[in-house]
Amino acid sequence: MENATLLKSTTRHIRIFAAEIDRDGELVPSNQVLTLDIDPDNEFNWNEDALQKIYRKFDELVEASSGADLTDYNLRRIGSDLEHYLRSLLQKGEISYNLSARVTNYSLGLPQVAVEDK
């Protein structure tokens, strides 16, 4: 695919590329493959169950968009919906902030701290 434009959606914690990753780790634009990068800055602590929930939600959103043109707008909509879903996982306590991250900016709200009754 020569001179193809790389379509992408980038939110704080979700990046989607209309591309494949080649053997050298480079993105190669594609109209057939979407590549998902979750939490590229390692801002959160993840478990396998939470990651699988994100992947399933991504698959669900892509399936709901099947038949629509592959555009920046459609990718941004999927990315935005995934970002909101990630926030819901944080609010439910299924993921947590990584306090050892390079930067702790609490971009989805301050951490919840359980207080014991005395």
From Swiss-Prot:
UniProt cross-references to Pfam families, sorted A to Z: NdhM
EC number: 7.1.1.-
InterPro entries found in the cross-reference section: NdhM
GO cellular component, one term: plasma membrane-derived thylakoid membrane
Lineage top rank: taxon: Bacteria
Swiss-Prot/TrEMBL catalytic activity: a plastoquinone + NADH + (n+1) H(+)(in) = a plastoquinol + NAD(+) + n H(+)(out); a plastoquinone + NADPH + (n+1) H(+)(in) = a plastoquinol + NADP(+) + n H(+)(out)
Main location per the UniProt record: membrane
Bilayer topology annotation: Peripheral membrane protein
Key words of the record: Membrane, NAD, NADP, Plastoquinone, Quinone, Thylakoid, Translocase, Transport
Chain's role: NDH-1 shuttles electrons from an unknown electron donor, via FMN and iron-sulfur (Fe-S) centers, to quinones in the respiratory and/or the photosynthetic chain. The immediate electron acceptor for the enzyme in this species is believed to be plastoquinone. Couples the redox reaction to proton translocation, and thus conserves the redox energy in a proton gradient. Cyanobacterial NDH-1 also plays a role in inorganic carbon-concentration.
Protein name as it appears in the record: NAD(P)H-quinone oxidoreductase subunit M
Organism: Nostoc sp. (strain PCC 7120 / SAG 25.82 / UTEX 2576)
UniProt lineage: Bacteria, Bacillati, Cyanobacteriota, Cyanophyceae, Nostocales
Gene that encodes the chain: ndhM
